[in-house]
């Protein structure tokens, strides 16, 4: 018999993602918290968006927080390697 530990991120009663590592589950949960905050903030934007568009943009911005932070701090895009690595990490985490 095999025993498997699984960490599940649940939002509003819905399973969002499961992980084998508590650290990864906590990071994903924190990213979802950030996306929720961004979604709330974007509702005050002068740009009108459908709810689905705003939610997708909020999630994407939260996923890209390191790149966004670099842009806001330096006024420049990070090197293509950093941007590419961020996208690859996101693809890998969604495959889990």
Curated annotation (Swiss-Prot):
<dbReference type="Pfam" id="PF07130">
    <property type="entry name" value="YebG"/>
</dbReference>
<protein>
    <recommendedName>
        <fullName>Uncharacterized protein YebG</fullName>
    </recommendedName>
</protein>
<dbReference type="GO" id="GO:0005829">
    <property type="term" value="C:cytosol"/>
</dbReference>
<dbReference type="InterPro" id="IPR009813">
    <property type="entry name" value="Uncharacterised_YebG"/>
</dbReference>
<dbReference type="GO" id="GO:0006281">
    <property type="term" value="P:DNA repair"/>
</dbReference>
<dbReference type="GO" id="GO:0009432">
    <property type="term" value="P:SOS response"/>
</dbReference>
<dbReference type="InterPro" id="IPR038627">
    <property type="entry name" value="YebG-like_sf"/>
</dbReference>
<dbReference type="GO" id="GO:0010165">
    <property type="term" value="P:response to X-ray"/>
</dbReference>
């Amino acid at each position: 018999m095999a025993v498997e530990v699984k960490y599940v991120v649940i939002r509003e009663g819905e399973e969002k993602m499961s992980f084998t590592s508590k650290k990864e589950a906590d990071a994903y949960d924190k990213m979802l918290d950030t996306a929720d905050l961004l979604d709330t903030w974007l509702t005050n934007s002068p740009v009108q968006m459908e709810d689905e568009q705003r939610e997708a943009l909020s999630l994407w911005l939260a996923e890209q927080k390191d790149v966004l932070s670099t842009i806001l701090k330096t006024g420049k895009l990070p090197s293509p390697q950093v941007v590419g690595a961020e996208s690859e990490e996101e693809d890998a985490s969604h495959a889990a």
